[in-house]
């Protein structure tokens, strides 16, 4: 390793990042937001699949939270358009990784963030009551929920919002589910992850 470092410094005039350089096991290695985990397939010992690092997942959530913050002066349609843009850009970069399972959790979380925006946009109790009735909630439940002391994020995850602000209604407002974007960009999503050409995709990303 020292010989390699010397060659990089003296011959190629490259700066070495000590934190990111070294001999590591694949599961300890992350680069450009990617990492590796074992395939966990019987008989496939020593094989790994490409995944997204935890830092990259956190960055995605931070971006979405910034867009859906109630203090952000944006209309609902503007928020939806911005989220669609962010998630498509993120998936374009990470589409070669095995992320379908984790995306299902993110998909539900994204919808709740939009429900949170809708609930906070309604602001006054009377407006909340009327809108809930328009969405099919009976008078008594609409009144009770419009006066609830629960916070906006708790209400966004409650049955009253899950059954009224459905995925179908969100799509009617222009929202594109992150799972739909992923399957569009990655038609091979239903193939076993260990059948994909991980090495070629990864090093193509590194070179580019």
Model segments located where?
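Non-catalytic terminal/accessory segments
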Residues: 1-208
């Amino acid at each position: 390793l020292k010989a390699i470092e010397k060659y990089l410094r003296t011959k190629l005039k490259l700066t070495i990042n000590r934190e990111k350089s070294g001999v590591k096991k694949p599961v300890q290695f992350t680069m450009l937001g990617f990492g590796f985990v074992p395939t966990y397939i019987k008989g496939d010992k020593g094989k790994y699949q490409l995944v997204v690092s935890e830092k990259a997942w956190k960055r995605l959530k931070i971006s979405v939270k910034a867009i859906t913050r109630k203090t952000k002066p944006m209309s609902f349609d503007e928020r939806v358009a911005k989220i669609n843009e962010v998630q498509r850009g993120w998936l374009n970069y990470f589409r070669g990784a095995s992320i379908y399972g984790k995306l299902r959790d993110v998909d539900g979380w994204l919808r709740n963030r939009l429900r949170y925006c809708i609930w906070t946009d309604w602001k006054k109790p009377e407006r909340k009551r009327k809108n809930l009735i328009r969405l099919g909630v009976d008078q008594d439940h609409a009144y009770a929920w419009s006066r609830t002391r629960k916070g906006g994020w708790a209400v966004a995850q409650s049955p009253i919002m899950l059954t009224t602000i459905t995925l179908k209604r969100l799509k009617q407002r222009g929202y594109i589910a992150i799972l739909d974007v992923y399957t569009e960009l990655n038609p091979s999503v239903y193939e076993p992850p260990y059948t994909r050409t991980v090495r070629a995709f990864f090093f193509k990303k590194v070179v580019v």
